[in-house]
Amino acid sequence: MSPTRAGRLLYERACEVLRLLEETGRQVTAIGRHDREGIVLGLTNGFANVVGRDLVLHARRDLPTVELSVVEERSVVLVEALERHEVDVALAYEVHERPGLLRVPLLEEETLFVTAPDSASRRRAKPSDRGRGRRGSRPIKFAELVTHPLVMPGPRDGVRQQVLATAKRLALPLQVTLDVSSVSMMKNMVARGDAAAIMPYGNVIEDIRQGTIVGRRIADPPLKRTMYLVRPMSRAAFEEEGGILHLIERMCRQYVDTLGELATPLAALRDGALHAAATTAA
């Protein structure tokens, strides 16, 4: 089912009106804040763990006219917050096409199979392996992964949905023994050997570096997900549009560098085309 020409025209004009209203609201708010533009940026836990601090510090130093607020949530929650206009722009994973949202794919990232370390693996691992974590062990095949009891986040989580879909496609049974929506609780249970898990590297980066959790890449097939910059089409452009997008691009590049072989930049990030792609409908 596709909209008629009249319907498309009405939608486009409605977006124009909403942008004008949004821009007026921003200007009025900026006057009340002594010309500081308020922007709410949504990030996932893993991304915030890796570059969140640097992002906030760079924003404070390089964007003095911006009052940046950061919201940390799961991707599905961030998308819903965008649609309610509680968040202005977000970096979220596996965002499907939705009316009124502009999506720009930024990078592709592998998730890891994480377990508690045993004493033998600790003795075998070199200090450099423990520091990097993710390269210290051989990859695990998906068919082997499913033989382990798993702790997984709730049904709406993107990683869980991907794991279940892959297992179904390969006709492999899963041993999901625990449903836990808390990242810190999942990591605690993995570290204590209660179960294994499939998690983004950013969520367990410090645990792997400290040796309390071991991360292994997943093969046959690897589990990959795409990070998008997402913003409402009805939102007016930021007054510091160029500065905000440059900051996001810079932090995404830093994130890719930190993940190394686990992340691949896509065209908008790789070719420096984020500003053009992210302002297409703004």
Where do the model's predicted regions map?
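Hydrophobic residues within well-ordered alpha-helices
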Residues: 4-7, 41, 81-83, 145, ...
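Short, well-ordered beta-strand segments
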Residues: 38-42, 90, 151, 197, ...
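Alpha-helical "hinge/linker" immediately C-terminal to small N-terminal DNA-binding modules
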Residues: 2-33, 250-253
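C-terminal effector-binding regulatory domain of bacterial HTH transcription factors
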Residues: 130-137, 201-210, 220-282
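Short amphipathic alpha-helical coupling segments at ligand-binding clamshell hinges
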Residues: 6-13, 51, 55, 162-163, ...
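Central regulatory/effector-binding core of bacterial HTH transcription factors
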Residues: 36-99, 180
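Hydrophobic hinge/microswitch elements
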Residues: 74-79, 83-87, 93, 156-214, ...
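Acidic, Gly/Pro-rich loop/turn segments at junctions of secondary structure
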Residues: 62, 73-148, 203, 222-223
